[in-house]
Amino acid sequence: MKYDSLADLVVQAEKQNVPLXXLIXKDQAE
């Protein structure tokens, strides 16, 4: 999962209803 900007990361987090952190972590794990 790659994002063009931090804003895109926030939007995806809101859509998936998961903590940013979790997404970031998940992103780093891949």
UniProtKB/Swiss-Prot annotation:
Catalytic activity: L-serine = pyruvate + NH4(+)
Enzyme kind, highest EC tier: lyase
UniProt-listed Enzyme Commission number(s): 4.3.1.17
GO molecular function: 4 iron, 4 sulfur cluster binding; L-serine ammonia-lyase activity; metal ion binding
Pathway noted in the entry: Carbohydrate biosynthesis; gluconeogenesis
Protein family per UniProt: Belongs to the iron-sulfur dependent L-serine dehydratase family.
SUBUNIT field: Heterodimer of an alpha chain and a beta chain.
Protein name in the entry: L-serine dehydratase, alpha chain
Species of origin: Anaerotignum propionicum (Clostridium propionicum)
Lineage: Bacteria, Bacillati, Bacillota, Clostridia, Lachnospirales
